[in-house]
Amino acid sequence: MSSKSSTQHTFGVHSEVGQLRKVMVCAPGRAHQRLTPSNCDALLFDDVLWVDNARRDHFDFMTKMRDRGVEVVEMHNLLAQTVAIPEARKWILDNQVVPNQVGLELLDEIRSYLEGLPDRELAETLIGGLSTHEFPETHGGEMLELIRDAAGVAEYLLPPLPNTLYTRDTTCWIYGGVTLNPLYWPARHEETILATAIYKFHPDFVGKVNVWWGEPTTDWGLATLEGGDVMPIGKGNVLIGMSERTSRQAISQLAATLFEKGAAQRVIVAAMPKLRAAMHLDTVFTFADRDCVLIYPDIVNEIEAFSYRPGEKPGSLELHKDRGSFVETVRDALGLKEMRVVETGGNAYVRERTQWDSGANLVCLSPGVVLAYDRNTYTNTLLRKAGVEVITITGAELGRGRGGGHCMTCPIIRDAVDY
């Protein structure tokens, strides 16, 4: 789809399965070349990537979406176009090059160096990181040598951000607006600043973005929110997983804001166990069609559902436990007589492996058409038997941070579905 076509539609995501029209992704790159066996845990990856293959597979992922009429925009490109705007470049550096991030010793020198970089190189550096050994001695002088000697080869003046691969989490579009999310792990905090800069300054977005909640320069304390837990499913309902990475404090604030602004009528909270293999709601539960969901039963069947609704007083909330199972709660919220459920398949061993390989992490391109990792053959076969068209992508490298197609996409424009 051309850029001209997508601009005929207002930014907003009105379902999980309607026609996907515009999406933001972030290709593997320099940040993933930084991953080593000694730092990958701290950077939230379970292993290092074969980066060349990851790039190839991600390009195929983007191509398959474009072949189905989706406009795909890539974060490195958007950021390079954003930092070409002097005001945007200054805003990013004002918020990235700060003592808490880079230290005091070389603060002015790092700022001066970054200000002088070409647009594309600055974008690559903001996402890919800047090590002490890459920083020019002409800028750092004797202080740089001392920092190198003291901190060693693993020290970064700007940290790499490999989790930008999973664009779902940093911001999430909920009906007609977006949230700028305070992420759980420190390794990801800077991602939201970069995404915010794109929405705030890029010509495609400036003046067109309605921010519901969140501000990346604010300390949110225990209020953390990640987009993998957030699903605007339609009919004024929003699903939010209370998970390893999304907290009750954030959910209640977001619910109150959505109600106050008339953006939603009900927020259904999925109370989940706090597990690495089920870090977000979308790792165990995704839609495959308007009336069909794929679930990892070992987790989803244990989810307790609660619902926030507007209280009687302005700004107040009512919270009630929902009757029935989580899937039944979702079915009833959408007014469906029946919700078809496909469970990730096989015996206990196959199910656990499938879950580790993001087998339940589908992204719908349109009703009944999904992208899924090729390696989860058993589950993909079950989806096809249920009438779902499954387009496969290679997940051997892309999934090493525990995310699939849903995690790797930030929908910006998606149609509603009639229920």
UniProtKB/Swiss-Prot annotation:
GO terms for molecular function: arginine deiminase activity. InterPro entries: Arg_deiminase. It catalyses: L-arginine + H2O = L-citrulline + NH4(+). GO terms for biological process: arginine catabolic process to ornithine; arginine deiminase pathway. The active site is at C407. It is found in: Cytoplasm. Keywords: Arginine metabolism, Cytoplasm, Hydrolase, Plasmid. Its main location: cytoplasm. Its EC number is 3.5.3.6. One of its GO terms (cellular component) is cytoplasm. Pathway: Amino-acid degradation; L-arginine degradation via ADI pathway; carbamoyl phosphate from L-arginine: step 1/2. Belongs to the arginine deiminase family. HAMAP family: Arg_deiminase. This is Arginine deiminase 2. It comes from Rhizobium meliloti (strain 1021). The lineage of its organism: Bacteria, Pseudomonadati, Pseudomonadota, Alphaproteobacteria, Hyphomicrobiales.
